[in-house]
Every structure is written in C-alpha cells, then in structure tokens.
C-alpha cells in the first residue's frame, strides 16, 4: 500500500486514543479549557456516566465567531505561539488537540459568545473531512460544550467503557482534583439531572479549609498539618496528614505543580520517603500539596495527559519537597487544624530547623505564631486565571548574586592571603550551603590585588589531568587533581555552625564492626559538625545525610574507611578530618577537558585565593619558555 496522508477524521481519532481514554478525560480537558478562559463558575452536566452527554458551561471570556472554526481544528490554540512559550507554560492546555480529538469520536457542539459580540454562535464538525458548520445561537457571555454519544463511531472503544457508576466515579474524582486546585472557582456537578457536588468559590484564604473539608472530608482536616516552605523560585504549601491517622486517609493524595494536577513519581517518592519511618509498608501518606516553580525549570510536555512532568533540577526539587514535609512531621505536639465556629484555625508551632536543600523556613520566626495556619498555607496562591500571569523570574538566583559579591570582595586591596604551607592552611569555609559566607583569611602578609588573584587563562588540557595555563607572563602546567583536592579541603572545612547535612534520596544501610561502632559513638559530635547524620542500631548503621561535597561519593566504601580512621584517634580536629577526607575522595573526572578545568579553577580562585600567590608543592610547575626558544634558535 502506498504512503498517503490520512484523512482528518482518522488522524483525529488516532490522536483521541491518547487524549480521550474515558469520559473523565473529556471532562478534564474541557474544564481546563474553561479555567484557561478565566471562568469563575463552571457547571458540569453528566448523563449515563458520560456515555450519553457531557455538558460543560462556563462564564469565561468566550470564543469569537472568527475563531470558532479554528477552535475545532487540530493544533490550533491561542495559548502558545512559539517555542519560548512552550518552554514556560502556565496555562492548562497548550497543544490544541483536545477539541479536535473529542469531536472525532463524538457529536460535539460548541456554543460561545464574547463580551464584544451582540449574539452567540454555535459550531460543530461533521463528515470525513471534519468540516465545521457555524450558525447563530442564544447564549450569555462564556462557552458551552456538549459532547453527545461518546465513542459512537468507535465501537471497540465504547465496548471497553465500564458501568455508569464506575465512569461517573472517575468523573467525580477529576472534578475533586480540579476543585482543590482552584479555590476561587465555583463548580457544580450534576448527574442524570441531580446535583451531586457543589463547590462554592472560596476566594478568601480563611475559607479554604471549608472547601478542603468538603472535598477530603472532616477526618483529613482534623489531622492535617499546614505546610508553607520556600527556597528561591521553589515554593510549596498545602497540608499533610498526621502519620497516626494516615491508615484511614490513604486515598487522599493530591499534588499540584503550578496548579496543574500531577501523579509524578519523583514527587510521590519524596513524600513517601519523608513518611517512611512513620508508616509501615501497607500504609500510604495523605496530603494535599501545591508546588510552585519557575515554568522554565519544568517540562509539562512529556505525557499525553500531562499527568507527569520532568524537572530540570530533579534532585533539588526532590530534596526540597522531602525536607519541607519532614520538617512539618517532626514538629513536637503539632496541633491539628481544628476549625472553630468562626472559621479560625490554630497555628502550629514550627520547628526551628531547616536544611539548605529546602531554603529558609520563614515560618520559624516568632511572628509566624500570630498568623493562622490557613494564611500560611495559601499565602502565595494565585487568585484566578485572569489575574494569574507568568512571574518575572530572575535569571540569577539570590545565592548567585551573593557569591558574586563575595567574589568581588576578594578583588579588593583590603583582602589578604596567607602563604599555603599545608592543607590545614586552607580557610575554614564551606560551599555546602550557598548562604554560608566564605571566611576571609585574617593573618595577612601580602595584599591580594585584582591583577594577581587569578591563575590565568586555560590554554589547553593534557590528558588526563594537567592544564596548560598562562601564568605570570609565561606558561605553567597545573595539576587539576591536586587543585580539586585543595578545593574539597576548603569545602569540607566546617564553619563554627558546622556543615549543613543534605538528605540522601534513599538512606544507606551499612554494616559496621565493633571498632567502627565505637568510633561512631565516640566521635558523634564531630560527625555532626561535618554534616554526616549516622545512626547505629544493632550493629547496623543508617546514613541519612551527608554534606554537599560528599553527595557524589561512594559512601558505602567511604564511611567505613572514615570510621576506621577515627577509631585510631581519641581526639581529632575538624580541619584534620577535612584534610583526610580531601585525600580520600575520588575525583569527579577521569579525563579532564578545558571547560571542566576552567570551572574548577574559578572555584579554587574564589575559595582558596592564597593558592594563587603561594602555590603548594605539586600544584603548579612553571615552564621555561626562554630555554625552549633558545633551543629552537640554536643559541
């Protein structure tokens, strides 16, 4: 059979296989279109579980007569127009496939009117070529979509539909999820002429618990702990259930990314990990969580139904969610959200602890106790689709500006360097947290000027690990592995408050001998100072967190070696231990390239500026260019 272009109806039916799984899929797509249109009221009418009729009526902005025909065409949308728009999506829909796909497997009628039009217009597509017919109609400002006889022309799909009760149950669940995402929108759900759900609009944050109770039930609300956490462009708020009550609330698992309902495995894993020590294998956590993130940092165009997303910084997002949920669950005597007759909610007492992966817990401040948990949980919710606009996300994160300021300070004549004689001479600084300032060297012997703070330009790299650089008017070979060791020494030298522990994605189980167990107990404070969270029970250790420089190491091998080293010393300083660790950590690169060398030297110049003026043995070897030139010229 020769290659041929498929007719529009067949092409749309193929696309419908991905978009339209069952009546609930139709409801989801159409209601999301209403939300994108700025609707504040949506009425949903269902007959026979959606097999006979699905009607969605809204008071949104409507569709003009000139755009009605395009609305039913494939790949036609008003929500994106360029690749840049696709990379920063905030609207619910964007592909322009839903209406065309639905109309190809049903009898779809679209009626709409804009505020500028004096009358409404109705459109429907029919025939093999999906030709669109438009005629005048009576309708207020907004749109109504009627989907009749779903799958009437695809008997195989219709045969796989479940009972009326089952299909309506799926529709009810979709509406529940959407109602939790948009508190500011009133939603009514009718089945066979009977009002089943009525979710009144709750624009006031103090009223959000009312809708939460109507959707998730009073039992969830009574055991809910409010959460509100922020780090840079990441923000999470919502509610998590007390683990003691999770066995009765396991079905309550709702998560949203930029107000889009999700069933993402990374998010579920982070939440499950936060609960793992509080629930058995048969129990599931209960939660309603909202994650707001820079739309440039998340790709929603990876799943046909948009149920999953891909985060550009998946580990950061995972650790952020894990730490936020863990901090709330670790509250001692955390009160439940108990609604009084006046609708007031008692504020929980927040734990004074927050690791770098999760940012600063702004609700650990004394004044936070004066505000209600409801206000905390929804302080950053967007009010409506019309008012919601893409935030002006900054290109540089705050910590990058802070590091840049520190970098400029190093160029000032007032900064000074001390000659490096041993690894212990490296300044006690840490980069495991962007918020920890780099400590300057106070015992100055020679000022560090902007002209001589740098090693010089990297010319090339000789495999596996030597960089040829411009140095003091000549050239020199620099050992990248030695420079990396000095950098790790600086990163591992703890400040007064210690290194910040970074939680592992999965806690590591390690078997120890008696000497290693004794070393773990004797040097517990030192390990905490180094950002290592290690607990021992019945001869087995559980490693839960390490400082940032250790995250990429082979911890299964490194930790027993570290404890073996500690068992040989009764007392040891953090700087000495940092020196030992720096010499035992594996290199991140077997063979270096120019870009990796430039990145490494930039970090070394910022954190270890004293190495530039007084390079230690083994780091730098100048090359005598004059001798080479003399040989070439036979002088």
Swiss-Prot record:
The record lists the organism as Yersinia pseudotuberculosis serotype O:1b (strain IP 31758)
* Function, in words: This protein is involved in the repair of mismatches in DNA. It is required for dam-dependent methyl-directed DNA mismatch repair. May act as a 'molecular matchmaker', a protein that promotes the formation of a stable complex between two or more DNA-binding proteins in an ATP-dependent manner without itself being part of a final effector complex.
Among Gene3D superfamilies, the record links this protein to: 3.30.230.10, Histidine kinase-like ATPase, C-terminal domain (3.30.565.10), MutL, C-terminal domain, dimerisation subdomain (3.30.1540.20), MutL, C-terminal domain, regulatory subdomain (3.30.1370.100)
Q: Per the UniProt entry, what are the Gene Ontology biological process annotations, in alphabetical order?
A: mismatch repair
Extract the signal peptide range. none
Top-level lineage group? Bacteria
Q: Which UniProt keywords apply?
A: DNA damage, DNA repair
Q: Which Pfam families match?
A: DNA_mis_repair (PF01119), HATPase_c_3 (PF13589), MutL_C (PF08676)
- Locations of Low complexity compositional bias? 364-377
Basic and acidic residues bias locations: 378-399
Q: What is this protein called?
A: DNA mismatch repair protein MutL
Disordered: where is this region? 359-399
The record's comment on protein family reads: Belongs to the DNA mismatch repair MutL/HexB family.
MF (Gene Ontology)? ATP binding; ATP hydrolysis activity; ATP-dependent DNA damage sensor activity; mismatched DNA binding
Cellular component GO terms, alphabetical: mismatch repair complex
């Amino acid at each position: 059979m020769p290659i041929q272009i498929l007719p529009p109806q067949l092409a749309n039916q193929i696309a419908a296989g991905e978009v339209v799984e069952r009546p609930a899929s139709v409801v989801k797509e159409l209601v999301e279109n209403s939300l994108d249109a700025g609707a504040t009221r949506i009425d949903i009418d269902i007959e026979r579980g959606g097999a006979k009729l699905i009607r969605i009526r809204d008071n949104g902005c409507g569709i003009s007569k000139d755009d009605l025909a395009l609305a039913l065409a494939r790949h036609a949308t008003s929500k994106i127009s360029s690749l840049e728009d696709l990379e920063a999506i905030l609207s619910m829909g964007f592909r322009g496939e839903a209406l065309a796909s639905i109309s190809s497997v049903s009898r779809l009628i679209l009626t709409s009117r804009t505020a500028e039009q004096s009358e409404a217009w109705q459109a429907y597509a029919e025939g093999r070529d999906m030709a669109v017919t438009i005629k005048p109609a009576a309708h207020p400002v907004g749109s109504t979509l009627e989907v009749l006889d779903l799958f009437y022309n695809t008997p195989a799909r219709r045969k796989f539909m479940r009972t009326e009760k089952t299909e309506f149950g799926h529709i009810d669940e979709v509406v529940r999820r959407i109602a939790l995402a948009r508190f500011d929108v009133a939603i009514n759900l009718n089945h066979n002429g009977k009002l089943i759900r009525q979710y009144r609009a709750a624009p006031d944050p103090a009223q959000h618990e009312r809708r939460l109770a109507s959707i998730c039930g009073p039992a969830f609300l009574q055991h809910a702990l409010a959460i509100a956490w922020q780090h840079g462009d990441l923000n999470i708020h919502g509610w998590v259930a007390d683990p003691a009550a999770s066995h009765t609330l396991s079905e309550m698992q709702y998560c949203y990314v930029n107000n889009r309902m999700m069933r993402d495995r990374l998010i579920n894993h982070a939440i499950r990990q936060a609960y793992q020590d509080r629930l058995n294998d048969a129990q599931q956590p209960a939660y309603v969580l909202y994650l707001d993130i820079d739309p440039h940092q998340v790709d929603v165009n990876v799943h046909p139904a948009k149920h999953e997303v891909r985060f550009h910084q998946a580990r950061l997002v995972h650790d952020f969610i894990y730490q936020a949920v863990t901090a709330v669950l670790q509250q001692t005597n955390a009160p439940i959200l108990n609604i009084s007759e006046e609708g007031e909610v008692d504020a929980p007492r927040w734990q004074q602890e927050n690791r770098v992966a999760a940012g600063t817990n702004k609700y650990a401040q004394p004044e936070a106790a004066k505000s209600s948990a409801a206000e905390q949980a929804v302080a950053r919710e967007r009010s409506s689709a019309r008012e919601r606009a893409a935030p002006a996300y900054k290109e540089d994160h705050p910590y990058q500006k802070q590091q840049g300021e520190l970098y400029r300070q190093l160029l000032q004549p007032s900064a000074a360097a001390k000659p490096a004689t041993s690894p212990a001479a490296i300044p006690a600084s840490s980069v495991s947290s962007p918020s920890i300032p780099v400590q300057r060297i106070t015992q100055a012997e020679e000022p560090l000027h902007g002209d001589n703070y740098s090693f010089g330009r990297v010319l090339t790299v000789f495999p596996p690990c030597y960089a040829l650089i411009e140095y003091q008017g000549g050239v020199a070979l620099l050992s990248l592995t030695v420079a990396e060791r000095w950098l790790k020494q600086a990163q591992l030298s703890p400040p007064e408050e210690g290194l910040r522990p970074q939680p592992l994605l999965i806690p590591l189980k390690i078997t120890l001998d008696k000497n290693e167990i004794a070393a773990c107990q004797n040097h517990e404070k030192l390990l905490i100072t180094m950002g290592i969270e290690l607990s021992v029970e019945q001869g087995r250790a559980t490693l839960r967190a390490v400082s940032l420089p250790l995250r990429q190491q082979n911890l299964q091998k490194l930790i027993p070696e570290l404890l073996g080293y500690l068992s040989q010393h009764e007392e040891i300083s953090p700087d000495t231990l940092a020196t030992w660790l720096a010499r035992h950590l594996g290199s991140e690169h077997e063979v270096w390239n120019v870009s990796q060398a430039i990145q490494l030297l930039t970090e070394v110049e910022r954190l270890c500026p004293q190495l530039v003026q007084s390079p230690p043995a083994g780091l730098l070897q100048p090359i005598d260019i004059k001798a080479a030139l003399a040989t070439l010229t036979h002088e």
